[in-house]
Design a protein with these regions (language model features):
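A detector for small-residue-rich transmembrane helices and their helix-helix packing motifs
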Residues: 1-247
Length: 247
């Protein structure tokens, strides 16, 4: 397992204001709107529910969920406005403090480089677009593989996966500091990001048809969808922007 903890930012010329702002927004939403995870009414109102996205109709009632030999009830809440708003809002919410910290670490490592490539405005659009596409990938896979469509999803990892897909394309040889086999070392970006993506693929195929809860609550298809979207779209978003100083 390879765990990134930083990278070489030599050649970066822009201060990554948007990356810092996104990190701040995620923290503020978790602390003040989600009440550090205790405000279930807000969390279940704005999480993305595949059934709602498919039908366009809000599901505001307790829903019984069964995963393997375990079962429980999810108290889905009414969503103010359109249910499609959850595709955007849910990417700023998290299920736990560790969920938040892990995502923000990856955004801090990889986001600044892509923001430097695209510029502040384009990076904002790129981040939001890949996040929404990641959520849609999760929705589509839910119905394709017969997972429970009432299980809500949330988190910035889909958008951050998009950033990592862009990083693989734009910075394949940039040195990334990682913890690998309990040792601190540096590897090229294509190794760090490529191994991460390989893990997502293996994990996704292991839980297909069993729902995200069987994979520890991780929506792996959102990660895969966001990553592919980022890898495909980053050059399009970079058209017309100045080239990054170093790859």
């Amino acid at each position: 397992m390879v765990f990134p903890i930083g990278d070489d930012n030599t050649g970066r010329t822009r201060t990554p204001y948007i990356t810092y702002l996104l990190i701040a927004l995620n923290v503020l939403v978790f602390v003040f709107l989600q009440g550090l995870g205790t405000n279930e009414q807000f969390t279940y109102a704005f999480s993305t529910v595949p059934q709602e996205i498919r039908t366009g109709e809000d599901v505001a009632r307790p829903v019984r969920i069964e995963v393997g030999d375990q079962s429980g009830t999810i108290p889905l809440q009414p969503t103010p406005g359109s249910v499609y708003l959850t595709l955007l809002v849910s990417m700023f919410m998290h299920g736990s403090l560790m969920h938040l910290l892990g995502n923000m670490l990856f955004l801090w490592i990889f986001g600044d480089n892509i923001e430097d490539d695209l510029g502040h405005g384009r990076f904002t659009s790129f981040y939001l677009a890949t996040g929404i596409l990641a959520s849609l990938a999760h929705v589509i896979s839910t119905f394709t593989f017969g997972d429970n469509p009432f299980i809500p999803s949330l988190g910035a990892s889909g958008a951050i996966s998009g950033v990592m897909g862009g990083y693989l394309v734009m910075h394949p040889h940039r040195r990334v500091r990682v913890i690998m086999l309990r040792m601190l070392t540096e590897v090229p970006g294509y190794v760090a990001v490529g191994l991460w993506f390989l893990f997502q693929l293996i994990s996704a195929f292991g839980v297909i048809g069993q729902g995200p809860q069987s994979g520890g609550g991780v929506a792996f298809m959102a990660h895969i969808g966001g990553f592919i979207a980022g890898a495909v779209l980053v050059k399009l978003f970079a058209v017309g922007s100045r080239p990054a100083a170093r790859r």
